[in-house]
From Swiss-Prot:
Its main location: cytoplasm. The lineage of its organism: Bacteria, Pseudomonadati, Campylobacterota, Epsilonproteobacteria, Campylobacterales. Its EC number is 3.5.1.5. GO terms for molecular function: nickel cation binding; urease activity. The gene is ureA. This is Urease subunit alpha.
Length: 237
């Protein structure tokens, strides 16, 4: 049996979830890892059964664990659990917010921040692009995803988004509802600008030749409008 790295990760997560289920059945309070594994494992199983929608699991997932089921401080550490699950009609992201009720106590390792604004991506020039979701499902794009290669049903000027990512905090995301149109800010991807993976539109150095190749592949694979006429304006210092 040969498994892909992604399949191995899911198998490991499923195994961890089973161990957490056994611990919970014995009355053992779960730690952070066990709680996340249990919730993720149940989501994957119920999604595979095909009897629940994403919305159903997002709601039901908040009922599986209570504060008395986890160790002190764990509830406040789990802000959300996101898992890509296989439904009968494809893979979908299920995000469960505040899956465990907070007990109100101080969390282990809690950080108290100063009451000051935090500047992200300081010194990076940004452009603004109008983006429209022409699909019938929400699309969520993470902070460091190569925006040029996002879902093909997002319509925008792909050429202007080459080698760029969202100008948002690391680990966060922007969500586009079906039919929604809004502007987003993009900044250059840092590092050596060698872009691999995502939707395999580049898979090389993101230079002029890489951009030309990427645009060609995007057009061939039907990635929205390669040039939809959206205007980009440099409006951030």
């Amino acid at each position: 049996m040969k498994l892909t790295p992604k399949e191995l990760d899911k198998l490991m997560l499923h195994y961890a979830g089973r161990l957490a289920e056994e611990a919970l059945a014995r009355g053992v309070k779960l730690n952070y890892t066990e709680a996340v594994a249990l919730i993720s494992g149940r989501v994957m199983e119920k999604a595979r059964d095909g009897n629940k929608s994403v919305a159903d699991l997002m709601q039901e997932g908040r009922t599986w664990l209570k504060k008395e089921n986890v160790m002190d401080g764990v509830a406040s550490m789990i802000h959300e659990v996101g898992i890509e699950a296989n439904f009968p009609d494809g893979t979908k992201l299920v995000t469960i917010h505040t899956p465990v009720e907070d007990n109100g106590k101080l969390a282990p390792g809690e950080v108290f921040l100063k009451n000051e604004d935090i500047t992200i991506n300081a010194g990076k020039e940004a452009i603004s692009l109008k983006v429209k979701n022409k699909g019938d499902r929400p699309v969520q794009v993470g902070s460091h995803f190569h925006f040029f290669e996002v879902n093909k049903l997002l319509d925008f000027d792909r050429a202007k988004s080459f080698c760029k990512r969202l100008d948002i905090a690391s680990g966060t995301a922007v969500r586009f509802e079906p039919g929604e149109e809004k502007s987003v800010e993009l900044i250059d991807i840092g590092g050596n600008k060698r872009i691999y993976g995502f939707n395999s539109l580049v898979d090389r150095q993101a230079d002029a030749d890489g951009k030309k190749l990427g645009l060609k592949r995007a057009k061939e694979k039907g990635f929205g409008s390669v040039n939809c006429g959206c205007e980009a304006t440099k409006d951030k210092q």
